[in-house]
A protein has these predicted regions:
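Conserved N-terminal entry element of GNAT/NAT acetyltransferase domains
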Residues: 1-15, 23, 162-171
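Conserved GNAT-fold acetyl-CoA-binding loop/helix
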Residues: 25-49
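A short helix-loop-beta-strand connector motif used in the catalytic cores of GNAT acetyltransferases and
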Residues: 48-63, 91
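Conserved beta-strand in the GNAT
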Residues: 63, 69-78, 96
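Conserved acetyl-CoA-binding loop-helix of GNAT-fold acetyltransferases
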Residues: 94-97, 103-116, 143
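Conserved active-site alpha-helix within GNAT-family acetyltransferase domains
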Residues: 108, 132-150, 161
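Conserved beta-strand-loop-alpha-helix junction that forms the acyl-donor binding cleft
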Residues: 113, 127-137, 154-156
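Conserved GNAT acetyl-CoA-binding A-motif
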Residues: 118-129
Length: 171
């Protein structure tokens, strides 16, 4: 996309980033009813979350700007660990592009720019999570070569107790 600026997020972007982060949350909640829903308290905490990300030395938040409007953003962090290999990991925590601007290469451009940061940290592997049922995310990340490695699973506590009771009664 021409006339697209990718730059580091700034403190002056925080309010818009909070709005976009909430849009992302709502978007993630749509395809899978089992996804945890954000509360009003959680919404109030988003500003603090964004500010903490901006302050992290080993993290980078980038924004895509078109005609003076933030149309997408990405956040990733670097971590070094000695207890597992690979040692240098890049984690993409957030990628969001506004609905009217998708499928124009903006997400790819944001990932490319974040990868410059990862390269400066000698990252060996990049990891991320996306919601099961989010076909756009599956397609986007799959096209970039990402393959699922692990699955997270949830159950309501009451249901787990019911299952455990039914198993006990069958024994």
């Amino acid at each position: 996309m021409r006339d697209l600026l990718i730059r580091s997020a700034e403190r002056s972007d925080v309010e818009e980033l909070v709005r976009l982060r909430l849009l992302l949350q709502r978007y993630m909640e749509r395809p899978n009813p089992r996804v945890w829903r954000i509360t009003k308290e959680g919404e109030a905490h988003l500003r603090e979350e964004i500010e903490e990300m901006l302050a992290k030395e080993d993290g980078r938040m980038l924004v895509a700007v078109k005609d003076g409007v933030i149309v997408g953003f990405i956040y990733g962090e670097f971590s070094h660990r000695t207890t597992y290999t690979p040692n240098n990991i890049g984690r993409i925590s957030i990628l969001h592009v506004r609905e009217g601007f998708r499928r124009r290469g903006i997400g790819k451009r944001l990932v490319e720019e974040l990868c410059r940061f990862f390269a400066s940290k000698n990252v060996e592997e990049v990891t991320l999570n996306y919601i099961i049922g989010n076909k756009e995310a599956e397609g986007f990340w799959g096209a970039l070569g990402f393959k699922p490695v692990r699955i997270g699973a949830n159950i309501r506590f009451e249901r787990l107790m019911e299952y455990l009771s039914s198993i006990d009664s069958q024994s």
